[in-house]
Amino acid sequence: MNMFASGTAALPLRASGVVVAPTVLAGGALSRVDQLKAQIRNPGEASFFYRDHHFQYDAVKVLPGEYFVSAEDLVIMTVLGSCISACIWDGRVRAGGMNHFMLPDGDSVDGFGRYGSYAMELLINELLKKGARRESMQAKVFGGAAVMAGFTTMNVGERNTKFVLDYLATERIPVVSQDVLDIHPRKVCFFPVTGKVLVKRLAHSHPETLAVEERKGNAATVAKATSGGSVDLF
């Protein structure tokens, strides 16, 4: 909904139905978050903008099937289980982007951004529009965790991880960092201007998987999975 339409401005609604007024700064200017919210977005482009008070940054959350590319000083964030996010950055133009796909490929016309084959092509093409070049791009890859015990014979996280690494190798985009597989969900925070990524491993929320590890006698894995989680810089 465009809150700048002529006539009486319509205010955006939260899911709860509560009206959310835009933040007006001194002098009557809208905050950058509200300016970002007001911009027209492409299909599949992330549009959940907010102020991250931990980093003191404007932020955008990338949901499954979405992507976001920017040369602005903000943070692009997502949370991953078996899904994969590729963070691709071109230091020459100081621009980067992130996607979030659920499966390597599929034949559904709905939610095509959920499939890696399309999500990777879309991310790279949007970076090229920002002036990036393939020969200058580098990638950091995250996710692919085995968070569901039912996928032991055909692990989705492993398939996603193999797909994205093979894809980037074919495209000759070097993977300079990765934090993949394992059993931990991850919160990924990507800074597209600098190319830096902060990853927090989250406490495991699937006790059935922990039970499997306990039966295997993997005490160290169980202890790690139930702890608060660590934060790493990539």
Swiss-Prot record:
Keywords: Chemotaxis, Hydrolase
Sample GO molecular function, one term: protein-glutamine glutaminase activity
GO biological process: chemotaxis
Reactions performed catalytically: L-glutaminyl-[protein] + H2O = L-glutamyl-[protein] + NH4(+)
Pfam families: CheD (PF03975)
EC code(s) of this entry: 3.5.1.44
Gene3D superfamilies according to UniProt: 3.30.1330.200
InterPro entries: CheD-like_sf (IPR038592), Chemorcpt_Glu_NH3ase_CheD (IPR005659), Cytotoxic_necrot_fac-like_cat (IPR011324)
Family: Belongs to the CheD family.
Role this protein plays: Probably deamidates glutamine residues to glutamate on methyl-accepting chemotaxis receptors (MCPs), playing an important role in chemotaxis.
Protein's recorded name: Probable chemoreceptor glutamine deamidase CheD 1
Organism: Albidiferax ferrireducens (strain ATCC BAA-621 / DSM 15236 / T118)
